[in-house]
């Protein structure tokens, strides 16, 4: 041991650990300075901090090893361990090539050990072996709630979603499209529609489907008193409705095509065998030609469905006389002479390629499709326009669309209106409002399945968010959506960040919700008891997975409860919103019948002539001289 301790002293000439490395050190310092300026420097240091420490310690040990005396490597290592503290008398590293190389080898060795250990490591998720599903809590929903109560979408008693599409932290941004599912009597109107109407944020307009026309009576006065412009489209009682004329909103030829497609998608013609067979395509040509002629050439007061019916009635076709020309043919001949490239002329010429017998069948199909317009009240309803759909995003407006929940005869009118509404608002946002409407337009689409097919709705709902438009699709079951929109139903649901389930028993809906909620891990306790000559008793514990809420549990869910699913957040099992606790509940007719809204009186008031309106004045001489 004496021989081992004797060389423990350092050599007579113990050089400083900076010796011979000044130039190298300056170069390294310059490189470190350059790297420090990068944006990811902090992250880089944190990730490599353990390896930097390993490099430093091994490099200092290498420096000490070089200055230890001994006859063999073992002797020098023993001296190193006995005097290890001397390596850190100076905190500065050594820049000797040998020391640096040994330090790098040490750091690389640590990196390799960690890599292979991590690669072969067992993955444990204690308590989550079969699933990690759980119910959300107040902490989960808190970042999504606006401090100002009115500036939220009401979802449940304890959960809300801020109306702003640009929260402080972008990761909490969600679109305001909501799927509400609830069977008959589950409270879709009471627990969702009315509470959100009572919110009345400063810059929000409403468009809502009103089955049976009860919501406008119960909430209309509150909205009117708050300064909302009330609009009513009533397909149950036309006398209690404002006028709606789709022709008023045609701005270009593409709008004509959209209108025709919507009419065909939501009505049926005689002779129609499939959605896109010969007869339907031929009808489309005729509709485009006639509507194009009416829009371009007819005076404004004649641009309506009544004129379209007159054109079809005058479009006689004879099987035995191919050269016969009806009055409509003559009109188009005159137009062709003036404007041979006219949109209506080009469409009509394609239609006229059909033989007399074929043309007659096409006209019969058109007549069957437009049969509802033979009702004088419907023609009067659509004679001119009072809806001002294009202004919904410019001022506080509440449009009530009253439909029958038992008869869908006139629901095609509603489908046409919604199709035009979406297109008008999107175009106005893009062309006149810099991409966003001045007022957010919320569509509360109660009984969505009864509205009819809105063409390309799956694409519309994916793009309306950026224009300050949102839709709440209210259904009795998910299967209703699939019946109408087929494969596009999944796309529509996928573009709704929020799903609210109020209760129901439809099996496919319960299955999908149960699967979406996921599974949680639970503890399973088993006992065994064997009797006989050698009786035994045993107890075992194990873990297993169970649905957070199974289908049978969903079907018997308490009527006061609901399930909320928000994208990126754990689901919530909460109480339905108590409408009586809202500060504006006393303004509804639910609280006081005196608050009932008189629709007929309001319409009469709205139809009064204003002093600023312009009129055509005609003077008639009724004197005796003129009559003589």
Regions found by a protein language model. Name each.
Residues 1-208, 215-228, 528, 532-556, ...:
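Accessory regions of macromolecular translocation/handling assemblies
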Residues 44, 48, 54-60, 122, ...:
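P-loop NTPase motor domains
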Residues 133, 160, 176-177, 346, ...:
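General secondary-structure edge motif
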Residues 139-144, 412, 448, 504:
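A short glycine-/small-residue-rich loop at the edge of a beta-strand within enzyme catalytic domains
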Residues 149-155, 412-419, 513:
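Conserved long hydrophobic alpha-helices within structured protein cores
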Residues 461-563:
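Conserved ATP-driven motor cores of ASCE-family P-loop NTPases powering translocation/secretion/packaging/pilus
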């Amino acid at each position: 041991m004496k021989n081992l301790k004797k060389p423990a002293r350092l050599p007579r000439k113990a050089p400083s650990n900076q010796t011979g490395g000044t130039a190298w050190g300056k170069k390294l310092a310059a490189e470190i300075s350059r790297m420090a300026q990068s944006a990811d420097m902090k992250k880089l240091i944190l990730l490599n901090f353990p390896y930097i420490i390993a490099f430093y310690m091994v490099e200092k040990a290498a420096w000490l090893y070089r200055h230890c005396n001994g006859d063999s490597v073992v002797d020098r290592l023993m001296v190193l361990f006995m005097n290890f503290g001397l390596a850190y008398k100076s905190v500065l590293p050594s820049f000797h090539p040998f020391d640096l190389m040994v330090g790098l080898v040490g750091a690389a060795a640590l990196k390799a050990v960690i890599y292979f250990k991590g690669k072969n490591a067992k993955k444990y998720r204690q308590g989550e072996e079969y699933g990690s599903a759980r119910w959300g809590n107040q902490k989960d929903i808190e970042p999504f709630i606006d401090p100002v109560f009115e500036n939220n979408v009401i979802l449940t008693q304890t959960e809300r979603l801020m109306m702003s599409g640009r929260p402080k932290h972008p990761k909490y941004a969600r679109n305001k499209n909501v799927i509400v599912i609830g069977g008959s009597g589950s409270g879709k109107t009471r627990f969702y529609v009315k509470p959100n109407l009572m919110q009345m944020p400063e810059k929000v307009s409403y468009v809502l489907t009103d089955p049976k026309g009860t919501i406008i009576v119960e909430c209309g006065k509150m909205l009117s008193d708050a300064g909302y412009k009330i609009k009513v489209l009533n397909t149950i009682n036309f006398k209690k409705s404002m006028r709606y004329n789709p022709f008023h909103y045609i701005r270009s030829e593409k709008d004509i095509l959209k209108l025709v497609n919507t009419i065909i998608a939501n009505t049926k013609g005689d002779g129609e065998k499939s959605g896109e067979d010969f007869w339907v395509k031929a009808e489309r040509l005729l509709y485009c030609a006639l509507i194009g002629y009416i829009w371009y050439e007819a005076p404004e007061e004649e641009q309506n469905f009544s004129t379209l019916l007159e054109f079809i009635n005058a479009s006689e076709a004879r099987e035995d006389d191919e050269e016969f020309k009806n009055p409509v043919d003559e009109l188009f001949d005159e137009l062709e002479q003036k404007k041979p490239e006219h949109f209506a002329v080009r469409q009509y010429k394609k239609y006229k390629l059909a033989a007399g017998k074929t043309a007659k069948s096409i006209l019969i199909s058109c007549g069957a499709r437009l049969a509802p317009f033979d009702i004088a009240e419907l023609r009067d309803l659509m004679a001119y326009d009072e809806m001002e759909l294009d202004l919904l995003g410019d001022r506080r407006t509440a449009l009530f669309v009253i439909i029958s929940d038992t008869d869908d005869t006139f629901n095609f009118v509603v489908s046409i209106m919604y199709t035009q509404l979406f297109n008008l608002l999107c175009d106005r946002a893009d062309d006149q409002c810099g991409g966003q409407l001045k007022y957010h337009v919320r569509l509360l689409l109660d009984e969505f399945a009864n509205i009819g097919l809105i063409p390309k709705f799956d694409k519309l709902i994916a793009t309306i968010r950026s224009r300050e438009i949102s839709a709440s699709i209210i259904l009795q079951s998910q299967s209703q959506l699939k019946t109408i929109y087929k494969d596009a139903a999944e796309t529509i649901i996928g573009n709704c960040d929020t799903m609210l389930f109020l209760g129901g028993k439809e099996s496919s809906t319960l299955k999908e919700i149960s699967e979406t909620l996921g599974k949680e891990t639970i503890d399973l306790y088993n006992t065994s008891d064997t009797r006989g000559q050698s009786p035994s008793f045993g107890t075992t514990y194990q873990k297993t997975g169970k649905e957070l809420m199974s289908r049978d549990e969903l079907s018997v869910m308490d009527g006061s409860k609901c399930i909320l699913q928000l994208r990126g957040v754990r689901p919530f099992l909460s109480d339905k919103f108590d409408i009586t606790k809202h500060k504006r509940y006393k303004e509804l007719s639910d609280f006081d019948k005196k608050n009932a809204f008189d629709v007929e009186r309001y319409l009469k008031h709205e139809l009064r002539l204003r002093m600023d309106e312009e009129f055509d004045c005609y003077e008639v001489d009724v004197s005796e001289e003129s009559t003589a």
